């Protein structure tokens, strides 16, 4: 799964898709981590995206870099506190947003029960299970 994390970091911008009722929604996100072969992302619990994921945990993450792209389809489930602590340690800027003073909480989500599709402009190259 390190390949997924490296691809997303190289791409710079990547996008998280959810469903709001019967309407698809997509937005850029910036936090994506891999720990011990497990994939995680994070969003603010005060945001619509978090409520959408709690209602329907099926998500997609997509990014493009150098005429190749990646699509991660998964179920996003809340991560255990030890992972939340690691995400904060590895992304110190999050403390400026999510802290006791702001009252905002970060929702760290593990990506499970999914697959990663590696593609080029010619079509899918390969698919791997999470």
Feature map (PLM): residue ranges:
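Residue-level signal for well-ordered, solvent-exposed loop/turn and beta-edge residues enriched
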Residues: 23-25, 75
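A short mixed-secondary-structure module that forms the rim of ligand-binding clefts
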Residues: 32-67
């Amino acid at each position: 799964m390190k390949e997924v994390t490296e691809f997303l970091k190289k791409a710079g911008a990547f996008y998280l898709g959810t469903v709001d009722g019967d309407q698809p929604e997509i937005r850029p996100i910036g936090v994506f981590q891999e720990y011990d072969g497990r994939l995680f992302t994070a969003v603010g619990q005060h945001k619509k995206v978090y409520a959408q994921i709690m209602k329907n945990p099926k998500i997609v993450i997509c990014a493009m870099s150098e005429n190749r792209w990646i699509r991660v389809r998964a179920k996003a489930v809340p991560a255990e506190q030890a992972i939340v602590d690691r995400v904060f340690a590895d992304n110190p800027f999050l403390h400026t947003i999510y802290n006791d003073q702001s009252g905002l909480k970060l929702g760290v989500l593990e990506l499970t029960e999914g697959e990663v599709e590696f593609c080029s402009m010619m079509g899918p190259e390969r698919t791997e299970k999470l």
